[in-house]
Amino acid sequence: MEKIVGFLNTAMKKGAFTLLCIFLIGISCKKETSGYVPPPPPPPPPVIDSVSIFGTQAPTGKTENDSTGGGIFGIELGVKFRSSVNGKVEAVRFYKTPGNNGAHTAQLYAGDGTLLASQVYGNETDSGWQTLFLSAPISINANTTYVACYFSSLGNYISTANGLKTAVTNSVLTALADSTDGLNGVYKYTNQPSLPDSSHLSNNYWVDVIVSH
C-alpha cells in the first residue's frame, strides 16, 4: 500500500511540475508576444497626376459649318501642344456644341505628322466635353510638339477667334501660341481623318488632351 501511495505522490508531483512548466512557458510567450512590433505597411502606390489643357473651360458661341463645295463635307480640327515633362496621353477630347452632329474621330499626331493614335468617339452627349480614352496610352516626350485633333464628318465645329494668339498653359501642358512651332489652331477640309495643316485667325477649336505624368 505504501508503494502505491508513494507512486501516486510521485505521479502527482510530476504532473504538477509539468503543468507549472506549461504555465511558465505560456507566460514567457505572452511577454514576448506583447513586445512584438509588426512591420510597417507597404508604401502606397505612387500618385499619377493627370491634367488637360483647358480643364473645365468652355467656349461661347454656336456650332459652325463651312460650306466648301467640291463634295468636301468634313473637317479636321486640332491643337499643337507640348508637355514640360515626359508623360502619356490618356485621352483626346473636344468640346461639342448643340448641332454638332455626325461621326467624330479622335487622332494624335507627332510633330512630324506621324499618326500615333486614331479612334472613333462613341456614346457622345448632345453637348459639353467629349472624352475618348485611348485603348493604349501614348507616351510623349517633354518639350516636344504633338498635334491633338478630331475629324468631324459633317463639318461641324466650334471656334474662338484669336484663342491661340497667345499660349494657353495649365500645369505641365501648353497649347502653343500660333507661329511658335508653325501654325496653330489648325484645320483641314477633308472627307476622312487627316493631319490638319491650315490656320485662320489663330482660332481655338477646343481640342484637348488628358496627360498623365
Task: List PLM regions with ranges.
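Sec-dependent signal peptide recognition
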Residues: 13-19
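Beta-sheet-rich sandwich/jelly-roll-like modules and their strand-loop junctions
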Residues: 30-111, 154-213
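Solvent-exposed serine/threonine-rich low-complexity stretches and specific carbohydrate-binding patches
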Residues: 115-125
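Exposed aromatic-hydrophobic patches
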Residues: 129-137
